[in-house]
Amino acid sequence: MANIKSQKKRIRQNEKARLRNKAVKSSLKTAIRKFREAAEAGNVEEAIILQRAAARQLDKAVSKGVIHKNQAANRKSAIAKRLHQLQQSQAA
């Protein structure tokens, strides 16, 4: 345990940030999992809605500094690609 007052405060702040980041990452995983499940089930309409929601949550996580913008871009690209494949398979 730190003896310096400012370090004690940093420990408290870091713990709060860790819990906040953990909650945001957990909700991101849930949003992406829901999209993936809808896509695997072949439900295009629901997948479109869930893809938008997941992309929105990824952007919010970037603005809060929870994840890097490139990681969010890669994840958004992957789910957009998956949605496009689903739409193409439904159209064919």
Curated annotation (Swiss-Prot):
GO terms for biological process: translation. Residues 1-22 are annotated as: Disordered. SUPFAM superfamilies: Ribosomal protein S20. Gene3D superfamilies: Ribosomal protein S20. Keywords: Ribonucleoprotein, Ribosomal protein, RNA-binding, rRNA-binding. The keyword Ribosomal protein applies. GO terms for molecular function: small ribosomal subunit rRNA binding; structural constituent of ribosome. Pfam families: Ribosomal_S20p (PF01649). Residues 1-11 have a biased composition (Basic residues). It comes from the Bacteria. GO terms for cellular component: cytosol; small ribosomal subunit. Binds directly to 16S ribosomal RNA. HAMAP family: Ribosomal_bS20. Belongs to the bacterial ribosomal protein bS20 family. This is Small ribosomal subunit protein bS20. It comes from Thermobifida fusca (strain YX). The gene is rpsT.
